[in-house]
């Protein structure tokens, strides 16, 4: 009967099978009833993770998803975080911070994408994560969701400028250009990042030549070479 539910809709049968002792049967029944939002809390309380994961995958209730993000089983936690990200749920800072404490970088990278939306202290914590998966997730979410310089971009630039280096590629609006120059002129920044930011202006005809002339005298060889190359290309 359980396998039959995969092929036909039979909610009455599925409801009765939810009470079975066999977790495989309950899992099939839960999958069959996945669209019934009123049953998600029941699935979430099931003793077996294969039933709880159905709630994690299908619920858009932020409180239920928040509780499932702290589930004892990693696959349920991952699914809950994935659902929260997919449905752009506005979760509390406390819930997101708990997610960032996970030992699993794949989970932390999902939480980090939500942190971009929320900003503030949670985003600051996510940006301090040294795992490349987490950093890539932040960069990708920024690329897709953030179209202009705002307080989140300024915050990330101060903590993890490498991420903003990627975001600034192909962005030449006034705010982006101002941020790029501020980072180039910040001598406490990594020379490689500063030189890459200069290279981003190659081919542009709106480069501030006065600022470029000053940067050409920089103490960093990398920055000086990048500035000289840009200056030469402008003169061609």
Task: Name each region found by the language model.
Residues 1-8, 16, 23-35, 42, ...:
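Structural detector for internal amphipathic alpha-helices that build alpha-solenoid repeat scaffolds
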Residues 46, 71, 129:
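Active-site acidic Asp-centered loop
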């Amino acid at each position: 009967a359980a396998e039959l539910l995969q092929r036909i809709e039979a909610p009455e049968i599925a409801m009765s099978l939810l009470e079975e002792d066999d977790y495989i049967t309950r899992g099939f029944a839960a999958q069959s009833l996945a669209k019934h939002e009123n049953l998600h809390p029941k699935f979430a309380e099931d003793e077996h993770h294969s039933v709880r994961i159905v709630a994690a995958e299908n619920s858009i209730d932020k409180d239920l998803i928040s509780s499932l993000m702290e589930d004892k089983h990693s696959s349920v936690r991952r699914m809950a975080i994935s659902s929260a990200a997919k449905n752009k749920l506005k979760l509390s800072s406390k819930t997101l911070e708990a997610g960032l404490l996970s030992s699993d970088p794949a989970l932390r990278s999902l939480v980090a994408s939500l942190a971009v939306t929320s900003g503030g202290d949670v985003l600051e914590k996510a940006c301090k994560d040294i795992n490349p998966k987490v950093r890539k997730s932040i960069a990708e979410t920024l690329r897709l969701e953030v179209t202009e310089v705002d307080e989140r971009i300024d915050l990330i630039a101060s903590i993890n400028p490498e991420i903003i280096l990627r975001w600034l590629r192909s962005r030449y609006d006034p705010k982006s250009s101002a941020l790029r120059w501020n980072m180039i002129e910040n001598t406490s920044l990594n020379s490689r990042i500063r030189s890459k930011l200069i290279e981003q202006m190659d081919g542009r005809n709106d480069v501030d030549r006065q600022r470029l002339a000053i940067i050409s005298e920089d103490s960093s060889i990398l920055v000086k070479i990048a500035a000289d190359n840009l200056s030469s290309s402008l003169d061609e």
